[in-house]
Amino acid sequence: MDRIIDTAATSEDEAIEVSIRPKRLADYLGQQPVREQMDIYIQATKARAEALDHVLIFGPPGLGKTTLSHVIAYELGVKLRVTSGPVIEKAGDLAALLTNLQPYDVLFIDEIHRLSPVVEEVLYPAMEDFQIDIMIGEGPAARSIKIDLPPFTLIGATTRTGLLTAPLRDRFGIVQRLEFYSPEDLARIVRRSAGILNIDCTTEGAAEIAQRARGTPRIANRLLRRVRDYAEVKAGGQITIEVAQAAMQMLKVDQGGFDELDRRLLHTIVEYFDGGPVGIESLAASLSEERGTLEDVVEPYLIQQGFLVRTARGRMATDKAYQHLALQPRERVSAFTDPEDLF
């Protein structure tokens, strides 16, 4: 399912992100607490001529975890090696990566929660002692040898910290959580991207795009490109607030950043199930969507923004959802009667 507001990166997103990715912390907009902390850690590390402590970065998709890893490596003045958890299938794959690192290099592992247990076992001594144990030979003749590694920094990124094993999580000396961006910070990001991509975008136009980007830079930059297309065909190329609003209407993205599927879900709960609670299977059947799509793609943002709640008896629309749909909240029996309401 292709959604303009999907947080998953498309091939176009990845290509554009490379060209607009900031290099320095000073250009990494938003996430002020993270920037301030990393600036201190990096300066102190460089002064001691050591490898930076291993870093775990977590948060929802599209907030800049990969970008931050590139910035950290640039500020340290070292090379960045990029890979992902699913790619490292065997212990030998990880060993090959680690033994090719230069002193103080940064190894970035995206989706680190998807590392296999066998690979994790190799990673533990590498992170703690800068050594790896490799098995040579097979059967009775097999033996373990230790290989010394240069000091390095591992940066792990994940959207699901709950899936990390405790031993792996405990080996990260620095843990940073990326939060959703404010509309103001997103507007600054849109203006910066517009400047790099030579897009004529007014301050008000950038703010309008940012308002509908669901707190996510990846979505903001994608919307910017689609609004640019609209502006070039319909409005002489300049993105004003009026042009941005017209483009968003064409894209069916409302002021809350909701698309048609978001609104259909809320409308269905409100109109057909009296605001809920309604089971996920019934909801999926009513919308002709798969359960997994609703649970993993649609619901998280609605829940995070307070438009939807999950209870033991099913999904319920909140008063905020009624207000967004310009409807009057109805009297409902509370669904919060089970001690496991939140699951």
UniProtKB/Swiss-Prot annotation:
Region (Small ATPAse domain (RuvB-S)): 182-252
GO molecular function, one term: four-way junction helicase activity
Region feature (Large ATPase domain (RuvB-L)): 1-181
SUPFAM superfamilies xref list: P-loop containing nucleoside triphosphate hydrolases (SSF52540), Winged helix' DNA-binding domain (SSF46785)
Catalysed reaction equations from the record: ATP + H2O = ADP + phosphate + H(+)
Keyword Lipid metabolism: no
Binding annotation for ATP: I20, R21, G62, K65, T66, T67, E128, D129, F130, R171, Y181, R218
Enzyme Commission designation: 3.6.4.-
Pfam families: AAA_lid_4, RuvB_C, RuvB_N
Main EC class the enzyme belongs to: hydrolase
Localization per record: Cytoplasm
UniProt entry keywords in alphabetical sequence: ATP-binding, Cytoplasm, DNA damage, DNA recombination, DNA repair, DNA-binding, Hydrolase, Nucleotide-binding
InterPro entries to which the protein is assigned, alphabetical: AAA+_ATPase, AAA_lid_4, DNA_helicase_Holl-junc_RuvB, P-loop_NTPase, RuvB-like_N, RuvB_C, WH-like_DNA-bd_sf, WH_DNA-bd_sf
CDD domains the UniProt entry points to: AAA
Protein residues bound to DNA: R291, R310, R315
Oligomer status and interactors: Homohexamer. Forms an RuvA(8)-RuvB(12)-Holliday junction (HJ) complex. HJ DNA is sandwiched between 2 RuvA tetramers; dsDNA enters through RuvA and exits via RuvB. An RuvB hexamer assembles on each DNA strand where it exits the tetramer. Each RuvB hexamer is contacted by two RuvA subunits (via domain III) on 2 adjacent RuvB subunits; this complex drives branch migration. In the full resolvosome a probable DNA-RuvA(4)-RuvB(12)-RuvC(2) complex forms which resolves the HJ.
UniProt family annotation: Belongs to the RuvB family.
NCBIfam families assigned: PRK00080.1 (NF000868), ruvB (TIGR00635)
PANTHER family: HOLLIDAY JUNCTION BRANCH MIGRATION COMPLEX SUBUNIT RUVB, PTHR42848
Designated name of the protein: Holliday junction branch migration complex subunit RuvB
UniProt organism field: Xylella fastidiosa (strain 9a5c)
Lineage: Bacteria, Pseudomonadati, Pseudomonadota, Gammaproteobacteria, Lysobacterales
Gene designation per UniProt: ruvB
